[in-house]
Amino acid sequence: MRRPAAPRAADVAAPARHRLALPALCIAALIAQIDTAIVNLATEPIGTAFGTRVGALQWAIDAYNLAYAVLLLTGGLIGDLYGRRRAFVLGATVLSGASVVCALAPTLGVLIAGRALAGAGAALLIPASLAIVRVLWRHPAERARALGIWAACGGIAMIVGPTLGGVLIHALGWRSIFGVVIPFGIAAIALTSAVVPESADPRGRRFDPAAQVLGAIAIGCVVFATIDARHDPQRAALLIGTGAAAIALFVRIERRLGTAALVPLDLFANRAFRGMLVGNGAMTFGGYGMLFVLPLAWQSHHVLDASGASLALLPMSVPFALVSFGSGAVAARVGARTAGAGGVALMGLGLAAIGIGAAGSTNPHAPMLAWAEAGLALTGTGLGLAVGSLAATAVGAVDAARAGTAASLMNVTRMIGAVFGVALLGALYDACGGGASGLRVAMLTGSALQLAGAALAWRTASTGTRAGAPRPIG
């Protein structure tokens, strides 16, 4: 009868350790989101400093997103094989070091390389932090609460990042924004090393280098083709063909490896899971594309400077942070499928409003930002509703044993959507002259694709259930 005493003592001690571990894990969400959001406001001064065009500037954002998306599954596998705390610390170290490279970059090429290195660090950091949450918080309700706090930090970063970035750019120049990550990274490394226990689960797992290389080639070719299509259509067509061939080989290898694959293909037989992927891609496609194009339009037409643009983005950031906390209750009432797809649809309506008011966002003599601010508020509300609801669908649509893989694929899809959003909407803005017409075409195109994605996600997930349990998703 005395055997249970030790577990009870450990259970008493565990919450204290968890309370110390959660801030370290939340810092990971903060620095990854800040490192993404803060750069959007710096595109115009970076372009001025290096004398470059929009197409090249897109790589300052896409290099991070692309490296993150391509390496995310490998980052999660490294944590499973060699230790999640070790992967977390390594990711924070790489991300902090990359920030130093970006801050000191003498050329745009070095800056882009530093951004890619930062994306690689985030690809280690984020899946490791999610896996640590799953290991430390074993009770579903407690784990859900911890993940909710973890996710809310992304909303806080969306408020702090642009505002802080605008202030720093105005006071100290664009290089200063990359220094923000460094102290947070050091704090995360120190706190995680002190309070987070090591864990690993290497059973039945191994690297899939061929699939990883093919995936990188496929994504890289298609994204580069999207950015470069206007300037060299023949090369863009060749890149798209190469990417398609890489995708075909990737699928063939993964099908042969079965459950040992980098991406087990049988996951995609689950309709709810497929719908979640569509919703996540549509969500970040429009959101990240808009956050690249709109601040660039404001600043390049001298409607707002960097600090003014950061304040003008608050109508998006504040609703996102506030709605995120209540998205679980909304999803419980109407279903995660409806809440997630509805949030993406709201974002699409927000982009449409920004497109309608494009003339006021690009006229320095008579600026009128009411349409843009209303659109940003809709976008932020939809984003806050969609993020948590789509994540809940990811966890609920598959067996618990595959929840980690599902979460990694969810983040891959988000970042791929972001890459294509920045590439395509930025290319449309540039191709249409970069003025009011460019902003209007980019935003209305993004709106149409988001609304279509929301409808497709809702329809695809309509009959989805968790594998092995006939449970409706929404």
Predicted regions and their residues:
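Hydrophobic core positions of alpha-helical segments in small-molecule transporters
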Residues: 60-63, 90-91, 113-114, 126, ...
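Membrane-helix interface residues
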Residues: 52, 82-83, 138-141, 171-172, ...
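Hydrophobic alpha-helical interface/terminus motif in multipass membrane transporters
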Residues: 43-46, 132-133, 168, 196, ...
